[in-house]
Amino acid sequence: MKEKVVLAYSGGLDTSITIHWLKENYNLDVIACCVNVGQDEDFDEIKKKAIKSGATKIYVEDVKDEFVSEYIYKGVKANAVYEGKYLLGTSFARPLIAKKLVEVAHKEGAKYICHGCTGKGNDQVRFEVGIMSLDPSIKVIAPWRIWNIKSREDAVDYANANGIEVPVTKEKIYSRDQNLWHISHEGGDLENIRNEHKTDMYCMTVPPEKAKDEVSYIKITFEKGEAKKLDDVEMSPVEILEKLNKIGGENGIGVIDLLENRLVGMKSRGVYETPGGTILYAAHKELEYLTMQKETFHFKQMVSQKYGELVYNGLWFSTLKESLDAFIDKTQEVVNGTVRLKLYKGNIMVAGMESPNALYEESISSFGASDFYDHKDAEGFINLFGLPYKINAMIQLKNQEN
């Protein structure tokens, strides 16, 4: 009986040719596993295509609920962003996909897992570190680091030579990754950084200049940092994100053109659409401004950066990341309330907030009289706060005189 390999299967170019290649070079039974994290695909067709391409069996795992509630929502609570711009759409999905691949491997008794990630990308690290973190006994096959196919153009040629249908041509060569959170576009004419990206590549969003002329208002209600209601209607995390994607897309929200520092050492360019996620991050951050004590908020900003780096680098299952989750969950106990936003042609503006945990008190913050704040107290505070700088200036003047 042949040994088995579980292939992370998408039906796209890379994994479509990988089934044929694995059977040709390793003589393994290929168990395809397609993990549904919200990508816009016909999964019945993917099942047919996997079997037609030579897979022995195909699993389609619908994990959208888990993806949003256990992965994306953790990122939102952390305000996790990579290099100030990237909302980690691909990075959030990879550890969950790795987890499902390991589960299928255990179920099938497979010793191998195969992925179609290139040897220059971050995803090979994310998948393999995730897999070894969950089961170090599983061996990983990474064709892009082994075979003679050196480019996506070569992959198209291989597919055509072997009669494998792929949804890519040499003329339209963008590499895309889509899930419920985002879609990314890489490769092709984007590799020349002199080129402005073409807005006709957009899938989730209209260009801001072509967005509707009317302003959109929305309200998002959070409990312990997690979005629970949209416009006062309670919804599941998936429903909230789907609605926000639609609203954000109509208003041209959430497109970035990013030149990022990859984990593997090079810079790469990608265009990312994250309409609903951009809105969710904005609303959540505004509520943190309102409800968090200053020192907690400032420290959490440092944690957010580190958290984003850990997720980007594929360290979702690391002790440090899990420890930061515990800290973040503690900070989110006060992040309760409703944020109203105004959306217009790519812009997000705050249009009001309320929270039972608000640390803003109008009677204190107002320029008018207050029983809680005596203006005279400011003089002593300023003297003490400025004392080190006053002493420093005195010493410098004294030294100059001497």
UniProtKB/Swiss-Prot annotation:
It is found in: Cytoplasm. It catalyses: L-citrulline + L-aspartate + ATP = 2-(N(omega)-L-arginino)succinate + AMP + diphosphate + H(+). This is Argininosuccinate synthase. One of its GO terms (molecular function) is argininosuccinate synthase activity. Its main location: cytoplasm. L-aspartate binds at T118, N122, D123. Belongs to the argininosuccinate synthase family. Type 1 subfamily. The lineage of its organism: Bacteria, Bacillati, Bacillota, Clostridia, Eubacteriales. The gene is argG. SUPFAM superfamilies: Adenine nucleotide alpha hydrolases-like, Argininosuccinate synthetase, C-terminal domain. It holds the Pfam family Arginosuc_synth. Homotetramer.
